[in-house]
């Protein structure tokens, strides 16, 4: 990783997005992966080492601008085994742009008889590097993430892809396993797209991620499938991996529109 970053941190809960967060739908708006990861990492800061976040439920209430952001974070529940947190992200005008609910569980050592599923997909070293289509060539999310297809390709709707960050979320700070997962998981619909991004938009107003264990290493795998309905709705279902094997799942609800079709 070089010295660039997705965000600058001005204070504990005040941030500024850089052009590396730029998404594919509007040059003024962020891809939802970076702000989802930003909030996830800051919620994790509230926990001691005995707890680990295992679920993130993100709702994008309005497009997240490339600009200054303020985060409000709090506990909703502080149990001995389970803790629940909320993060509210606001733009510079004070408008709510993203809500996040996180669930953390206290970890402990269990019987070794519990077996983890093995890796059943090709690894990044065996996969072909590609670029996201139709992203602005200027600094953007598409150029800030390295992407490789292990199986399938754009337009097929059912793929296995690998992603890793070229830049950290914050300057000089190594991304956490949770941040690496969240910044990539929001691309499940992007890698498994069935329609051309030049003709259609398929935004996801939400993202739900559930994890069985922390990711290891830089690469996050997306075993993603998109299903769509002619009435403009869809679901992207993504099995999440690291190079050791499956680590969890991500689900996105899709809002599908033709680019030249006005909303009713």
Across the structure, where does each feature detected by a protein language model lie?
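Terminal targeting signals and extreme-terminal segments of soluble enzymes
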Residues: 1-264
């Amino acid at each position: 990783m070089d010295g660039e970053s997705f965000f600058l941190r001005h204070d504990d809960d005040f941030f500024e997005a850089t052009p590396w967060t730029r998404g594919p739908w509007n040059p003024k708006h962020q891809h939802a992966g970076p702000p989802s990861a930003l909030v996830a990492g800051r919620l994790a800061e509230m926990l001691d080492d005995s707890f680990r976040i295992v679920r993130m439920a993100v709702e994008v209430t309005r497009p997240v601008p490339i600009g200054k952001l303020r985060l409000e974070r709090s506990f909703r529940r502080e149990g001995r085994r389970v803790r629940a947190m909320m993060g509210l992200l606001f733009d510079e005008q004070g408008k709510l742009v993203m809500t996040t609910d996180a669930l953390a569980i206290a970890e402990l050592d269990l019987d070794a008889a519990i077996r983890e599923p093995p890796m059943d997909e090709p690894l990044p070293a065996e996969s072909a590097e590609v670029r996201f289509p139709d992203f602005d060539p200027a600094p953007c999310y598409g150029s800030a993430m390295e992407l490789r297809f292990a199986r399938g390709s754009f337009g097929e709707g059912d793929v296995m892809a690998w992603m890793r960050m070229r830049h950290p979320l914050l300057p000089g700070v190594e991304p956490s396993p949770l941040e690496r997962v969240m910044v990539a998981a929001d691309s499940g619909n992007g890698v498994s797209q069935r329609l051309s991004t030049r003709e259609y938009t398929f935004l996801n107003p939400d993202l739900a991620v559930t994890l069985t264990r922390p990711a290891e290493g830089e690469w996050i795998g997306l075993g993603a499938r998109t299903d769509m309905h002619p009435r403009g709705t869809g679901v992207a279902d993504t099995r999440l991996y690291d190079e050791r094997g499956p680590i969890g799942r991500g689900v996105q609800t899709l809002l599908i529109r033709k680019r030249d079709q006005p909303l009713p």
